[in-house]
Amino acid sequence: MRLLSFKKSKIVSIGTELEFQIIDRSSLSLVSRSKELMRALKDMRYRDQIKPEITQSMIEINSSIHQSAKEMYDELLELQKILVETAASIDIAFCGGGTHPFQQWTMQKIFPSKRFKKKFNQYRYLSKRATVFGQHIHIGCPTGDDAIYLTHALARYVPHFIAISASSPFYLGINTNYCSSRSTIFNAFPLSGVIPYLRNWQEFSDYYRKMYRWKIIENMKDFYWDIRPKPELGTIEIRVCDTPLTLRKSILITAYIQALALYLLKEKPVQLSHDLYYVYNYNRFQASRHGLEGELTVTDKDKPILIMDDILETIKKIEQYINGLGNSEYIEELYSDVINKQNDSVLINKIYKQDGSFTKLVAAQCELWLSDSKDRKWMTQPS
């Protein structure tokens, strides 16, 4: 079979998508207001970079393509500013976090687009249950073969990404005792989890065309894998991260993945084999459940290691790529978080323990969401 086309991208160019919670300013619950928000944004700058998601209590911002994490950060701040200015007119707030701590998925409303209505008819309750919030990170690849290699090679580091981004310990009003409960939600979808063991772009093209011919998929969006190729963009997309509480944390995560991807593409240190996937689900569980203190089984080591220790070792290993990309400031901050066993899940638990109040927790999350821009006049707080 002929190859699928793959749009050539600059090596490790970056882009991100961030899904945020739409919050009622009085009750601090999720509120289905994305239709109103999209109408209010109709004539705004960056309108095409702010999008609805499958349920109406979600909103997504999309960065453009960048080489620099700092430039991406500046753009995300501008997108945040537009959201806040628009929200003021319709009395809503926003926050990060992978889950809303006390929302009930049964109360969610599907956004009335053709695509989302079709997905709801296909997946029914799973669609509403997917009212959880993630950060997706795109990494540019020069070729389809590079994209397949990177998709597999990064699978070894998926526990890192879950652990450093974890921000969803509460779900449906309970303490799940998971650092990232969000990362367990999509397991029920078909074509979720890990990409099949396809070794190059030719094998992937053959697989894609068969799945299309068999009417299992219509397009690349029907694959819910943790990491998937996006040939129309010339990227691979990492989909396992919870939405962080702050924009800055989203940049730390992106900067780490960018440097790691450059190391992997330049040095090709990961030998692709089935062994990678023998331990994949177990390692993923460890990160979801225990975060930075989860145990990681590495196939070329005799005994498990802590995820946090593996992250710290990896940062040292890829230092030259971190420096070359200008990401040192962000990785130093991430290194400090990891060595001190800090992620957003830890912070959320700490805030909740102060008052035992979910509404106060959400109010704090709304404040944290704006903390990157605390010196800006347009900053507003939930009432």
From Swiss-Prot:
Keywords of the record: ATP-binding, Ligase, Nucleotide-binding
Enzyme class of the recorded protein, top EC level: ligase
Stated role: ATP-dependent carboxylate-amine ligase which exhibits weak glutamate--cysteine ligase activity.
Xref: HAMAP family: Glu_cys_ligase_2
Record GO terms (molecular function): ATP binding; glutamate-cysteine ligase activity
EC number: 6.3.2.2
Alphabetical list of InterPro entries matching this protein: GCL_type2/YbdK_subfam (IPR050141), GCS2 (IPR006336), Gln_synth/guanido_kin_cat_dom (IPR014746), YbdK (IPR011793)
GO terms for biological process, alphabetical: modified amino acid biosynthetic process
Protein name: Putative glutamate--cysteine ligase 2-1
Annotated organism of origin: Legionella pneumophila (strain Corby)
Family to which this protein belongs: Belongs to the glutamate--cysteine ligase type 2 family. YbdK subfamily.
Keyword Ligase annotated: yes
Catalytic reaction equation(s): L-cysteine + L-glutamate + ATP = gamma-L-glutamyl-L-cysteine + ADP + phosphate + H(+)
NCBIfam families associated with the record: gshA_cyan_rel, PRK13516.1
